[in-house]
Each structure stands twice: as structure tokens, then as C-alpha cells.
């Protein structure tokens, strides 16, 4: 069997799908994308196709290493996201050829179902509470919320009080009937993160995500030393080499690699195993589409330390398409009390509606995250 073609489809709301075709008619699907940089990743995928056309798709490890090592310059969000989507598609092909789900090729299940959580947007507490109640009625009891708005390097007590009051109101509305993590989104400097985390401790969030940017990862250990709250990070780390430094430094309790950014299944299985050796939990980042979610699930179901799986059903970013709109076998991704079962079909287990993908790709938006500014006019972290 030989790889014959790679085709990319940019799609609403902000996704990109990849189809890898073979000379024997077996196709694999992947989801290589950086939110807001889909065209750039698309170009990288097609550059990497030079290493793939005419090659045996079953040699996933060799193809991964070739894509990673054959170029003198490597790593980073664009190249690793391109590799990630290609890697997902290769695993999809291999599972389909052998007639088994990918998790069977990775050693089999370590659990029967995986707990998921839902991201809830909204700037006002009333909006967040309403969103959480709607999801709670559908069986969710684990959520992730924005921890704060933009903050200056040294900000005011008023800014801290506003962030804390918002969380206090949400906790008061639900008591201990729900769990929620707080995502700082890298918006907070190290000095302010230390203050804000301490003030939030009484409300017992499940974790604090990206309290500072990944570029400031050396700060995680210092922050962790001043709080009992678990620190989560990893969505903006792109290889096991990035995660190696974080694990060695300590401070992070939950790793959050993104299966569409951090090299795909091949790389993230290694990252999960590294985390287990340090007694660190795994909770893959996934505000993306169905192929990315399926890839996450295959890693979750073979990783003993996987504890939570993000999923994007109903997320506010999904303007123009919902999580399962491009999927025929929607029932296979049904949530039961906030849990999801292992994928059933061979490969990644996602039956893509290719005709719909082709049609909707004609109207793909160029999504960009907003640009925020501080009161003094300087650019703020989003």
C-alpha cells in the first residue's frame, strides 16, 4: 500500500480536516490546525507531503521521525500541528486496514469510559451560571471557565476582586454539586498569578490552567509551592521535549497536550507515559473538531493517568458548525452522564461525511482570535 494524495479542507467554525488517500482505496482522516493560523498549517501539510507520497502508510513511526527530523529546523506550533494531523490520518488508515480501533493497536483499554468536561464561555456570572445549568441538565458536572479578563503585569486590587467575586458567585450558585477548572489563558503575569491563585483558593477550583504563558514555564514550580491548587498546562507545548522540561522542573499536576498541536497520537502517547512516570495526570486539550476529539480519546483509553477530556460540544467558538455536524456516526460519540465510551469503528472511529466537508469547505472563514488592549493602549494577552 502506498500514499497517493493529501487533501486539506478548511471548514467552519475554525477547523481543518485532512484526507490521506492510498492506492488501495483506504483513506485516513486527521485534523491539523492552529486556531487562527489554519492557512499556515495547511501550507506546512502540503510541504510535508513530499516525505509521504509513495510511502507505506503503515510505517507510522518512520514517517513521523522523517517529518520531524528530515528538516534542519523543527518543532513549534505550525510544523508540529501539521505532523499531528498527518499522524492521526496514518493511524486511521492502519486501524481500518487491520479492522480494529486505534486503541487496540496501542495495547488496549485501561478504562471503560472517559469523563469529559465542557468549556463554558460568558463574561458575566449570570451568563456562565445559565450555561452551566443547561449543561448540568444534560449530565455534565465538570466544567472549565475563564479565570479572569486581561490583566496588567502589576494590576489593581479592583481587578483581583472582580475576578474573585465572579468565581465566588458561581461557586455559591452550585455549591459542591459541580467541579470547575479556571483557565487563566496565559493572561496573567507571574506576580499577579501568585496573588490571584491565593485569593481563589477558598472556592476550590479543580485546577488553575495556564496561570502564566508556556514561555514562562519555569514559574510553574514557584507558583505551585505557594498553593494547594493543582496547576494545569500544556496546550501551547508542542513536543515531548517541551514537556520534558516542565516535568523535570515540577509544579504542574495536570498535563494538557493538544492532539492536533503536539505531534498527534504517536507523540502524545509518549507524553502521557512521561507524565505517568512523574505522577502527573493527563487531560488533553481539545476545543476543536471531531477528529481531534477521537484522537484524544484513543490516547485517553490507553493512558492510565488520563483523568479528564475536554470536548467542544456547544462551545461558543462553534459558529457555523457543531462538534458532530460532519460526522455520520453521531451516536458513537453520545455522552452518558458526562462520560463517553470508546470509539467503536476501526481506525479513529469517525465516519466523516465527505460530501458535506467538500461543500462546507467552500465557505470556510478565516477565524482570528480577538486583539485585546490594556487601558494604556498596549496589547494584552488574549
Curated annotation (Swiss-Prot):
Site features described as Increases basicity of active site His, chain residue numbers: 258
GO molecular function, one term: magnesium ion binding
Cofactor notes: Binds 1 Mg(2+) ion per subunit.
BP GO annotations: amino acid catabolic process; D-galactonate catabolic process
Cofactor names: Mg(2+)
Gene3D superfamilies registered for this protein in UniProt: Enolase-like C-terminal domain, Enolase-like, N-terminal domain
Cited SMART domains: MR_MLE (SM00922)
One Pfam family here: MR_MLE_C
Residue positions of the active site: 185 (proton donor), 285 (proton acceptor)
Catalysed reactions, semicolon-separated: D-galactonate = 2-dehydro-3-deoxy-D-galactonate + H2O
Note: Reaction proceeds via an anti dehydration.
Protein name (record): D-galactonate dehydratase
Gene: dgoD
Amino acid at each position: 500500500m502506498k500514499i497517493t494524495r493529501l487533501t486539506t479542507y478548511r471548514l467552519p467554525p475554525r477547523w481543518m480536516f485532512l484526507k490521506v488517500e492510498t492506492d488501495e482505496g483506504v483513506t485516513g482522516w486527521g485534523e491539523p490546525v492552529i486556531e487562527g493560523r489554519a492557512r499556515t498549517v495547511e501550507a506546512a501539510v502540503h510541504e510535508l507531503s513530499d516525505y509521504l507520497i509513495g510511502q507505506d502508510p503503515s510505517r507510522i513511526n518512520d514517517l513521523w521521525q522523517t517529518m520531524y527530523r528530515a528538516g534542519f529546523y523543527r518543532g513549534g506550533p505550525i510544523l508540529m500541528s501539521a505532523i499531528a494531523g498527518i499522524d492521526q490520518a496514518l493511524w486511521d488508515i492502519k486501524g481500518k486496514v487491520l479492522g480494529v480501533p486505534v486503541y487496540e493497536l496501542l495495547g488496549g483499554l485501561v478504562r471503560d469510559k472517559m469523563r469529559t468536561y465542557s468549556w463554558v464561555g460568558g463574561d458575566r456570572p449570570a451568563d456562565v451560571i445559565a450555561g452551566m445549568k443547561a449543561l448540568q441538565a444534560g449530565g455534565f458536572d465538570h466544567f472549565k471557565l475563564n479565570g479572569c479578563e486581561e490583566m496588567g503585569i502589576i494590576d489593581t486590587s479592583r481587578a483581583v476582586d472582580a475576578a474573585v467575586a465572579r468565581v465566588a458567585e458561581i461557586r455559591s450558585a452550585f455549591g459542591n454539586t459541580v467541579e470547575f477548572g479556571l483557565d487563566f489563558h496565559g493572561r496573567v503575569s507571574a506576580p499577579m498569578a501568585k496573588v490571584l491563585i491565593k485569593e481563589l483558593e477558598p472556592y476550590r477550583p479543580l485546577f488553575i490552567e495556564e496561570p502564566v504563558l508556556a514561555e514562562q514555564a519555569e514559574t510553574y514550580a514557584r507558583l505551585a509551592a505557594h498553593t494547594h491548587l493543582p496547576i494545569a498546562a500544556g496546550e501551547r507545548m508542542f513536543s515531548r521535549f517541551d514537556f520534558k522540561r516542565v516535568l523535570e522542573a515540577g509544579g504542574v499536576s495536570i498535563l494538557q497536550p493538544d492532539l492536533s498541536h503536539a505531534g498527534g497520537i504517536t507523540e502524545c502517547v509518549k507524553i502521557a507515559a512521561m507524565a505517568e512516570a512523574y505522577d502527573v495526570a493527563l487531560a488533553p486539550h481539545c476545543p476543536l473538531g471531531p477528529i481531534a476529539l477521537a484522537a484524544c480519546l484513543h490516547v485517553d483509553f490507553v493512558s492510565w493517568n488520563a483523568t479528564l477530556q475536554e470536548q467542544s460540544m456547544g462551545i461558543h467558538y462553534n459558529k457555523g458548525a457543531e462538534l458532530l455536524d460532519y460526522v455520520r456516526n453521531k451516536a458513537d460519540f453520545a455522552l452518558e452522564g458526562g462520560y463517553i465510551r470508546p470509539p467503536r469503528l476501526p481506525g479513529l472511529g469517525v465516519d466523516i461525511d465527505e460530501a458535506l466537508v467538500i461543500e462546507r469547505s467552500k465557505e470556510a472563514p478565516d477565524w482570528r482570535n480577538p486583539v485585546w488592549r490594556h487601558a494604556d493602549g498596549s496589547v494584552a494577552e488574549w
